[in-house]
Design a protein with these regions (language model features):
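C-terminal effector modules of eukaryotic transcription factors
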Residues: 1-173
Length: 173
């Protein structure tokens, strides 16, 4: 009570980040896009980067899987130009965090919340994979579950607005 914020004594900057809508743990700085289409383009870019990196990793595992049965040399010798630098494809968690930082902004600006399901699902799957291996990413999973409820609420709101309109108004909408 003694530290209640007022005009003379504003909230300390470290607590303001926690109570502002953009300062939700574990993603403290939300992105704000120029418009919903720009935000959606970024979300889908980050989503495809995650999927592409996972594809490269699985190809790398398949190529370098030891061949024990028929060959005396169980590790394949690939030419230098076919060598893959796997460190270039280890940024999935960063891309998933970028998706989560942008989801709220795009949800606020869009009238098509269903377009956010795929990026949200890809980020959720990545964090679940991380959590199954290392018990990390639980806060991120909880944040995405919370976002899913906001996404459902926005979808129901848009559906309610469309159902309350007459068909001629929907056609011009």
């Amino acid at each position: 009570m003694a530290n209640r914020p007022s005009f003379e004594q504003p909230v300390a900057y470290w607590t303001e980040e926690l109570i502002s809508p953009g300062g939700l743990i574990p993603f403290t700085n939300s992105y704000a896009f120029r418009d919903a289409n720009t935000g959606l383009a970024f979300l889908y870019y980050w989503m495809t980067q995650i999927l592409f990196h996972q594809c490269i990793e699985s190809l790398h595992r398949a190529i370098y899987q030891p061949v024990i049965d028929a060959y005396p040399n169980m590790w394949p010798d690939l030419p230098f130009d076919l060598q893959i630098d796997l460190n270039r494809y280890q940024h999935g968690r960063m891309f998933a965090a970028d998706i989560c930082r942008g989801l709220d902004s795009v949800l606020h600006d869009t009238v098509q919340p269903d377009m956010l399901i795929m990026p949200m699902t890809v980020a959720m799957d990545l964090y679940r994979d991380i959590n199954s291996v290392s018990q990390d990413g639980l806060m991120e999973i909880m944040w995405i579950d919370n976002f899913r409820s906001r996404l459902i609420e926005k979808g129901q709101h848009v559906a309610g607005v469309l159902q309350s309109q007459t068909w001629s108004e929907v056609a011009t909408f």
